[in-house]
Regions:
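Soluble catalytic regions of membrane-associated enzymes that act on cell-envelope
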Residues: 53
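Juxtamembrane/start-of-transmembrane alpha-helix segments at the extracytoplasmic/lumenal side
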Residues: 183-205
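Secondary-structure boundary elements
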Residues: 1-50
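Hydrophobic/aromatic-rich core segments of domains that either
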Residues: 57-132
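Alpha-helical transmembrane segments
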Residues: 203-220
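Extracytoplasmic/lumenal ectodomains and periplasmic regions of secretory and membrane proteins
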Residues: 105-183
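Linear, non-domain "peripheral" regions
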Residues: 1-3, 193, 221
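Short, charged juxtamembrane terminal tails flanking transmembrane helices
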Residues: 220-226
Length: 226
């Protein structure tokens, strides 16, 4: 196991991010589970690689296997823009930290901690870290091509809560319950096609059972009064 001998979650998170970065290529993984809309499974990404969303999905899945809470985060250039990049935010012993498996980058703080999305938003710390690594690794490294906006976290979030009426209503409901939607980890079923399909089928089955129960109840009620 690539995390053998590591004693902290931050070390495990960093080594998994680095391993996924070096595992196969960076092109979009066109495999999928059952239907194309579900995208590739973490195992399919493990076998053939993938782009930022694909590799981030694999990192998050591997972290969950270690019991480390994590989720995908999307980066937006502006509040109403489309997402331009995907990476991972994970919980470690000091809070939350961001790792990016498409560029092999994390964001350490000067005091030995690591930075999460909330720490990076509204600052130049992400871009400063990028410039530092570009200088350290030299022109032969892939990171020289990383654009600054992929290290800018001002509008980063796990879900686009403004996408439609349903997501806005969900965000409002979470706020009423005392949760900050922007600080919630992305639900696992959005990252695992098999789990998403399983939950969808269970929901359909539950609706069928409920509908059957209602029909039978109405039928018995009608028979009682006829």
């Amino acid at each position: 196991m690539i995390t053998a001998g590591l004693t902290s979650d931050s070390a495990r998170i960093r080594i998994i991010n680095d391993w996924v970065y070096h595992n196969h290529g960076f092109g979009k993984n066109n495999q999928f589970f059952v239907v194309p809309a579900l995208g590739p499974t973490p195992v399919q990404v493990l076998e053939t690689g993938g782009d930022c969303g694909d590799k981030s999905r694999l990192v998050s899945a591997m972290l969950r296997e270690l019991g480390i809470q994590s989720g995908l985060v999307m980066i937006f250039s502006c509040r109403d823009c489309m997402p331009i990049h995907t990476l991972v935010e994970a919980r470690y012993e000091g809070g939350r930290m961001v790792v990016d498996p498409i560029w092999d980058i994390d964001y350490p703080a000067a005091d030995g901690r690591f930075l999460g999305v909330r720490d990076l938003a509204g600052t130049s710390l992400g871009r400063d870290r990028l410039a530092q690594l570009q200088l350290q690794r030299g022109t032969a490294d892939k990171i020289r091509w990383m654009p600054e906006n992929e290290a800018t976290f001002d509008f980063a979030k796990p879900l686009n809560w403004d996408k439609n009426l349903v997501t806005r209503f969900a965000a409002y409901g979470l706020s009423l319950l005392g949760y900050d939607p922007g600080q919630l980890f992305r639900p696992q079923f959005l990252e695992d096609p098999k789990l998403a399909l399983t939950l969808a089928l269970l929901a359909v089955a539950a609706m069928i059972v409920a509908a059957n129960f209602v029909v039978r109840a109405i039928s018995e009620l009608c028979n009682k009064y006829t």
